[in-house]
Amino acid sequence: MQIKHTVTLAALALAAGCALAQQGVSKTEITIGSIQDLSGPAVSLGKQARLGMMLRVDEINEQGGINGRKLKIIVEDSGYDPKKAFLGAQKLVNQDKIFMMVGHIGTAHNLAAMPVQFEKNVINFFPLTAAREMYEPLHKLKYAFSVTYFDQIRKTAPKLVKEKGIKKVCTLYQDDEFGLEVMRGGEAGLKSIGMDYTEKTSYKRGATDFSSQVAKMKAAGCEMVVLGTIARETIGSIGESRKTGFNPVFLASNAAYNDAIHKLGGKAMDGLYSSMTAQNPYLDDNSQPIRFWANKFKTKFNDDPSVFAVYGYLIVDTFAKVAEKAGQNLTTDSFAKVMDTMNTPPDIFGSPSTSFSPTKHMGSDAARLSQIVDGKWKVVSEYIN
């Protein structure tokens, strides 16, 4: 009887220990996950985000880890397909047992993955999409860092319209949650100055031919086009426009703010405006800290960094700072408790300060404008709050 009683107690103790154990956190390691486009239409963004994350993870581990624990990151490829993002989330959450999902790229993709995460109490931390659904409605497992696509365009479109005396504004947008957010932001911004779109036209995710959409906007006499496009589609639609002699003012969201636009699109991309926060890290940047960081990245990966590498780097950096403050007993709850009082100052890349609270899970609503001038992005406005 005594032996049986002892065995029963031991089993209960083991079960209690398992129940209390935090997924993704061991005595020696913290495992986080991310889902990127490493093979689809946003591959130029996803690969850079992954490398930026890897750079910061390696730095953290070289410096002793987080409270003595090494940081491990597992990255899955969605190919920019929400169905693959869902499967990737299932693997990361249920098989790899990640502590947190960080910097997952894509609006529809995050929406597909979040239910899988939330079922296992896994935070969706700083996704690489600026859709409002990333922090609305308020949820204990949602944290976003960037001004929304909606607010970016709501603030910047009226500014350009007024400055350039534009009378006719049109929009070309991806027919999904991302594109609709950009389109609606422009709609709200125009409404604030007594205007509306002259023409709206859309395309399906992954499209490569924009001739019919461009012809439609050209026929409508559009003087400015709000682009709900990412990388390949920005290049394709502007390239088609230039080819047909249609040269309006183009304004995109920060989804199109990266160096792939001018590197792949060439001279035709000059003049494009984009809303943005952190600036693209050129190897010959005027800022010495940015030059140092960019050249460190180049040395490690033999590739020029883009702003998506910066995003990946900063996301892991903020995660590490919060996890460090949460202490040795790192759990979802202890992380969230720190996060709900977190403030970050502006960084070397010009990102705005951020602040979080129990009722505010989006870091900043500030945006500024950049323009491609002579084949490089150049910041052309202060922050618009």
Please state what every model-predicted region is:
Residues E29-T31, S44-L51, Q63-Y135, Y203-F210, ...:
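Beta-alpha junction/loop-to-helix N-cap segments that form part of ligand/metal-binding clefts
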Residues K300-A309, A320-W377:
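Segments of small-molecule ligand-sensing domains
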Residues A85, F145-K168, T208-S211, T234, ...:
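Hydrophobic alpha-helical segments within soluble ligand-binding/sensing domains
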